[in-house]
């Protein structure tokens, strides 16, 4: 994947400046509301809101992985090999769920960034999440 200087700047500076865990919790909660069948992977959770403990804890894991992708934009796939295997072989998460969560992250970024979330910015973040979804899906057969 080729990243332009504008794309690299947008992703790295925005990621540094935002409350990633809050963003992640809101994106997960949105996914659970809009796509309720995705809750099936979280049988241990009792609540599916952005302020619930379980959602916040999973958001930390998700945003931690997204942070790894931000710092390794030139080689996201190799960074996600183990995570992809875990989700494919142990957790049996449907690849489509990653795409749904990515959409929810983009929506939450738009809400957070408001006027700074121009169409070009949205396109950058959709590209980033597309790369991440591709990377976490690579071990699926």
Curated annotation (Swiss-Prot):
Summary of the tissues where the protein is detected: Red blood cells.
InterPro entries recorded: Globin, Globin-like_sf, Globin/Proto, Hemoglobin_b, Hemoglobin_oxygen_transport
Binding, heme b: 58, 87
Gene Ontology MF terms in the entry: haptoglobin binding; heme binding; metal ion binding; organic acid binding; oxygen binding; oxygen carrier activity; peroxidase activity
Domain Globin: start-end pairs: 2-141
Gene3D superfamilies linked to this entry: Globins (1.10.490.10)
GO biological process annotation, one example: hydrogen peroxide catabolic process
Keyword Ribosomal protein: no
Any one GO cellular component localisation term in the record: hemoglobin complex
Keywords: Heme, Iron, Metal-binding, Oxygen transport, Transport
Similarity comment text for this entry: Belongs to the globin family.
Function of the protein: Involved in oxygen transport from the lung to the various peripheral tissues.
Known partners and oligomeric status: Heterotetramer of two alpha chains and two beta chains.
PANTHER family on file: HEMOGLOBIN FAMILY MEMBER, HEMOGLOBIN SUBUNIT EPSILON
Protein name, UniProt field: Hemoglobin subunit beta
Protein species of origin: Heterodontus portusjacksoni
């Amino acid at each position: 994947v080729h990243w332009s200087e504008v794309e690299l700047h947008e992703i790295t500076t925005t990621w540094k400046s935002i409350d990633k865990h809050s963003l992640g919790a809101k994106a997960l909660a949105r996914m659970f509301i809009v796509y309720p069948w995705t809750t099936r992977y979280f049988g241990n959770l009792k609540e599916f809101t952005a302020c619930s403990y379980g959602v916040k804890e999973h958001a930390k894991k998700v945003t931690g992985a997204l942070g790894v992708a931000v710092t390794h934009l030139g080689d996201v796939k190799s960074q996600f090999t183990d995570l992809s295997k875990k989700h494919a072989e142990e957790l049996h998460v449907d690849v489509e769920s990653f795409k749904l969560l990515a959409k929810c992250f983009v929506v939450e970024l738009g809400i957070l960034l408001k006027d700074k979330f121009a169409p070009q910015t949205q396109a950058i973040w959709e590209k980033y999440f597309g790369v991440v979804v591709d990377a976490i899906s690579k071990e699926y057969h």
